[in-house]
A protein has these predicted regions:
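PLP-dependent enzyme catalytic core of the Aspartate aminotransferase-like
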Residues: 9, 80, 121, 130, ...
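Conserved N-terminal alpha-helix of the aminotransferase class I/II PLP-enzyme fold
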Residues: 41-93, 115-123
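Conserved small-domain helix->loop->beta segment predominantly found in fold-type I
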Residues: 273-276, 280-282, 287, 291, ...
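N-terminal "arm"/small-domain region of PLP-dependent enzymes with the aminotransferase-like
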Residues: 2-63, 71-72
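Short hydrophobic/aromatic beta-strand micro-patches
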Residues: 224, 346-348, 408-410
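Conserved PLP-enzyme active-site core in the AAT-like
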Residues: 2-3, 16-20, 83-312
């Protein structure tokens, strides 16, 4: 099956298993629940371990179920290679660790997910890797923050939790002018609504736990390598361009070509630190991927109706959603998301934390939990949970206040969702 000209909805079902399983004729992707793989002979084993022959070596590095998932996500994002790992946090960590060393620096939008913020602000500095966080509403802040030792710029297609939008193409131009890659978290955007590589991103990461899986049942993360960044011409990334002693002097740019970045993560970081996705989780995430477009359409449709309801409610102080003409990122929303977006967003109830908690505790359909992008509608109070590790100043910088509530709008009937929100607001 030629996949080059197929539509997204077809690719999400078929890529990676265009024909039935060759060993069993099974049409569904099998769960290859194994730790190891038999080599044809000693020479074959040596070639695999020396990166001279692609294929399975050991379950910590590769698995055939995982491989289908990786190919499919890479195809949907328009990249040359994908790498699935145990969680979105692992994907983001590897994305940075792959091209940084002690003494290096990263520039990141300050509006990113709290877990990513903690990684960059507190964990990576203990390894000697520092980050400057910038206000992304002024693009010049990115350029001002770049230093001689800066190795990447990091942003999200839709900020977590406020769904702010950054001009990807403008930030990409800044990054490339300084010969560094742009890494984008597209968890909230999804490749169905936006493909960051088409707008200049070099590396795309996902928490596959969210929209890709879609049902709150399995953890997973994925990294997609665009294959477009010229690591050699940059001259800043010896990890990819100079001989690697682990593989007897192999240069990843020679051994893997355009997929050098993704290959090094698998061959070095995954080998040494082992944040491996299980075959079963890869299988479950594949099931979710097959209906991604259908679910996202309903998520967005419902979300826009909820936004309209909340925006006109007397007990709501503010709704943070880029579809609103009053939102500062509305023009970028129209430009980058012509089919709509952002079923995960925040709003402020009038009052403060007490009123926010009472509202949340009065909801009946919405589940109070830390996940998002489930078919079930979800709610949480960011300041006291997901972003509670931030100090007061950091919370204000991320526009998270005592009355802020985050909603993740699911696929239930819209009338039921609005009725639930209405009765809960009546309690405050």
């Amino acid at each position: 099956m030629a996949t080059k000209n197929l539509h997204f909805e077809t690719l999400q079902v078929h890529v990676g298993q265009e024909q039935a399983d060759p060993a069993t004729d099974a049409r569904a992707v099998p769960i290859y629940q194994t730790t190891s793989y038999v080599f044809h002979n000693s020479a074959h084993a040596a070639a695999r371990f020396g990166l001279q022959d692609p294929g399975n070596i050991y379950g910590r590095l590769t698995n055939s179920t995982q491989g289908v998932f990786e190919q499919r996500v890479a195809a949907l994002e328009g990249g040359v290679a994908g790498l699935a790992v145990a969680s979105g946090a692992a994907a983001i960590t590897y994305a940075f660790e792959n091209i940084t060393r002690a003494g290096d620096h990263i520039v990141a939008a300050k509006t990113i997910y709290g877990g990513s913020y903690n990684l960059l602000a507190h964990t990576l500095p203990s390894y000697g890797i520092t980050t400057t966080f910038v206000d992304p509403s002024d693009l010049s802040n990115f350029e001002k923050a770049i230093q001689e030792n800066t190795k990447a710029i990091f942003i999200e297609t839709l900020g977590n939790p406020n769904s702010n939008i950054i001009d990807i193409e403008a930030v990409s131009e800044i990054a490339h002018r300084h010969k560094i890659p742009l890494i984008i978290d597209n968890t909230f955007g999804t490749p169905y609504l936006i493909r960051p590589i088409e707008h200049g991103a070099d590396i795309v990461v996902h928490s596959a736990t969210k929209f890709i899986g879609g049902h709150g049942s399995s953890l997973g993360g994925v990294i997609v390598d665009s294959g477009k960044f010229d690591w050699v011409a940059s001259g800043k990334f010896p990890q990819l361009t100079e001989p690697d002693p682990c593989y007897h002097g192999v240069r990843f740019v020679d051994a893997a070509g355009p997929a050098a970045y993704a290959t090094r993560i698998r061959a070095i970081l995954l080998r040494d630190t082992g944040a491996t996705i299980s075959p079963f989780n890869a299988f479950i995430l594949l099931q979710g991927l097959e209906t991604l477009s259908l679910r996202v359409e309903r998520h967005v449709e419902n979300a826009l109706k909820v936004v309209n309801f909340l925006n006109n409610h007397p007990k709501v102080k503010k709704v943070n959603h880029p579809s609103l003409s009053s939102h500062p990122d509305h023009a970028l929303y129209q430009r980058y998301f012509p089919n709509g977006a952002s079923s995960i967003f925040t709003f402020e109830v009038k009052g403060g934390q007490e009123e926010a908690h009472r509202f949340i505790d009065s909801l009946e359909i919405f589940s109070l939990l830390a996940n998002v992008a489930d078919v079930k509608s979800l709610v949480i109070h960011p300041a006291s949970t997901t972003h509670s590790q931030l100090n007061a100043q950091e919370l204000v910088e991320q526009e998270i206040y005592p009355g802020t509530v985050r909603l993740s709008i699911g696929t239930e009937h819209i009338d039921d969702l609005i009725a639930d929100l209405e009765q809960a607001l009546a309690k405050i």
